[in-house]
Amino acid sequence: MTQAATRPTNDAGQDGGNNSDILVVARQQVLQRGEGLNQDQVLAVLQLPDDRLEELLALAHEVRMRWCGPEVEVEGIISLKTGGCPEDCHFCSQSGLFASPVRSAWLDIPSLVEAAKQTAKSGATEFCIVAAVRGPDERLMAQVAAGIEAIRNEVEINIACSLGMLTAEQVDQLAARGVHRYNHNLETARSFFANVVTTHTWEERWQTLSMVRDAGMEVCCGGILGMGETLQQRAEFAAELAELGPDEVPLNFLNPRPGTPFADLEVMPVGDALKAVAAFRLALPRTMLRFAGGREITLGDLGAKRGILGGINAVIVGNYLTTLGRPAEADLELLDELQMPLKALNASL
């Protein structure tokens, strides 16, 4: 886990006066000093008028280039266990509590290895094994262990896992098997979490992340934007992530799934999504910020390009867990067009 972002000592939303322009403040504080914006300052960014969006994106890109460099990390993900989850995350079609078309299924080890091979061929350095569970039982841990061993024997790629909430023993087991990074999203601001999930708490997720950090694995933690949270809660979420100090923050945008409680929510407006991308970059200047699920329906091709030029420095290629993504070739062509080099495997170890 990266060191928690340096926070400004001035708690004023505009860092030194009500008449200060937030982008001028951000240029001095974030770009020049590498200090992330605080919660009030992030809110001021999110509240900027649309006619300042391009200026905001340009600044976020400068911050990304200065504090993270030009390289882009590419990752692929695969679902080892799909569907049948006992939790009630309102955005998720894999919950067994909703009338969703997704049914429970397991992936066999040869298919897992083949997926890892295809991911590596795309230029990705990270392959994440995901399971739709509250937390892994003995069967799942054994399957994950077998999968990790099989992949290591045939594919040169970093292995990440996303298996829900863990016990201390399970954390140690994954670390001992060389898991490079563990993903467990907080999903949204603490104050909004009960509107999204009722079968477990925000604090339970935080506890898993703390154990992962203490075990020496990299921490991947982000969430989903556009689930009905206010701008104030969006800013709160950015500040909470900055306090956590993860190595990677995946930004998802709600793609309303049939049969879920959020099925009828509207897709997040493009301008709001891009402002959020830039705002999270200004809150987390040194953190890997990854485009994840929902960007296709929310941003489209042009929006994705603007996001990569507005603070993003990592992408998931190919399909997601239950929804289609962009073809890997399309993302790689875009990165080549933008002259963004891919992060090499040896640089990510």
UniProtKB/Swiss-Prot annotation:
Using the chain's own numbering, where are the disulfide bonds?
A: none
Residues bound to [4Fe-4S] cluster are 85, 89, 92
InterPro entries the record matches: Aldolase_TIM (IPR013785), BATS_dom (IPR010722), Biotin_synth/BioAB (IPR002684), Biotin_synthase (IPR024177), Elp3/MiaA/NifB-like_rSAM (IPR006638), rSAM (IPR007197)
Reactions this protein catalyses: (4R,5S)-dethiobiotin + (sulfur carrier)-SH + 2 reduced [2Fe-2S]-[ferredoxin] + 2 S-adenosyl-L-methionine = (sulfur carrier)-H + biotin + 2 5'-deoxyadenosine + 2 L-methionine + 2 oxidized [2Fe-2S]-[ferredoxin]
Q: How does activity depend on temperature?
A: Optimum temperature is 37 degrees Celsius. The enzyme is stable up to 40 degrees Celsius and deteriorated at higher temperatures.
EC number(s): the record gives 2.8.1.6
Describe regulators of its activity.
Answer: Requires the biotin synthase auxiliary protein BsaP for activity. Inhibited by acidomycin. Competitively inhibited by 5'-deoxyadenosine (dAH), S-(5'-adenosyl)-L-cysteine (AdoCy) and S-(5'-adenosyl)-L-homocysteine (AdoHcy).
Identify the residues that bind [2Fe-2S] cluster. 128, 161, 220, 290
Listed under GO biological process in this entry are:
biotin biosynthetic process
Knockout phenotype, as recorded, reads:
The deletion mutant is unable to grow without extrabacterial biotin. Cells lacking this gene are shown to be highly attenuated in a mouse tuberculosis model.
> Keyword annotations for this protein?
2Fe-2S, 4Fe-4S, Acetylation, Biotin biosynthesis, Iron, Iron-sulfur, Metal-binding, S-adenosyl-L-methionine, Transferase
Gene3D superfamilies documented for this protein:
Aldolase class I
Q: Which residues carry this modification: N-acetylthreonine?
A: 2
Q: In which pathway does it act?
A: Cofactor biosynthesis; biotin biosynthesis; biotin from 7,8-diaminononanoate: step 2/2
> How is activity influenced by pH?
Optimum pH is 8.0.
Obligatory cofactor(s): [4Fe-4S] cluster; [2Fe-2S] cluster
Provide GO CC annotations from the record.
Answer: peptidoglycan-based cell wall; plasma membrane
- Cofactor comment text: Binds 1 [4Fe-4S] cluster. The cluster is coordinated with 3 cysteines and an exchangeable S-adenosyl-L-methionine. Binds 1 [2Fe-2S] cluster. The cluster is coordinated with 3 cysteines and 1 arginine.
Q: What does the record give as the function of this protein?
A: Catalyzes the conversion of dethiobiotin (DTB) to biotin by the insertion of a sulfur atom into dethiobiotin via a radical-based mechanism.
The entry's other comment says: Was identified as a high-confidence drug target.
Q: Tell me the subunit arrangement.
A: Homodimer.
Entry similarity comment? Belongs to the radical SAM superfamily. Biotin synthase family.
What HAMAP family has UniProt attached to this entry?
BioB (MF_01694)
Q: What is this protein called?
A: Biotin synthase
Source species of the chain: Mycobacterium tuberculosis (strain ATCC 25618 / H37Rv)
